[in-house]
Regions:
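ABC transporter nucleotide-binding domains
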Residues: 1-128
Length: 128
């Protein structure tokens, strides 16, 4: 079973000029222990796909259809409270934007460890 699987994900944005189909039928799967790179041109939907997985879309954005399965559980069916428990604890995203990306002058491990320690109570420095 895949750790993460998107099935025909469609994420749209309602605008005054109509509906923008930011993500229109994306499907992929990621097995545990594997790495997946999402590559595309600016505006191709990479960030919107990630924000859809985390259910952190702007007010006018919505998942129109499709499934986002994490450990077999459809994240689109979870309450925001349930998603809050998953975000940062089980699923995280590192964006390339300067304010949200990794600092190039700090070791990546230290930055990831900091995120783990912020989201997981009871985890030691060594475990993180």
């Amino acid at each position: 079973m895949a750790l993460l699987e998107l099935k025909n994900l469609k994420t749209f944005f309602a605008t005054k000029r109509g509906t923008v189909k930011a993500v229109n039928g994306v499907s992929y799967s990621l097995d545990a222990g594997k790495v997946l790179g999402v590559v595309g041109e600016s505006g191709s939907g990479k960030s919107v796909s990630a924000m859809s997985i985390l259910r952190l879309l702007d007010g006018n954005g919505y998942i129109d259809s499709g499934e986002i399965l994490f450990n077999g559980q459809d994240l689109t069916k979870l309450s925001m409270n349930e998603m809050y428990k998953i975000r940062g604890n089980e699923i995280s995203v590192i964006f390339q934007e300067p304010m949200t990306s990794l600092n190039p002058v700090m070791k990546a491990g230290k930055q990831v460890r900091e995120a783990v320690l912020l989201h997981r109570r009871g985890v030691s420095q060594k475990e993180a």
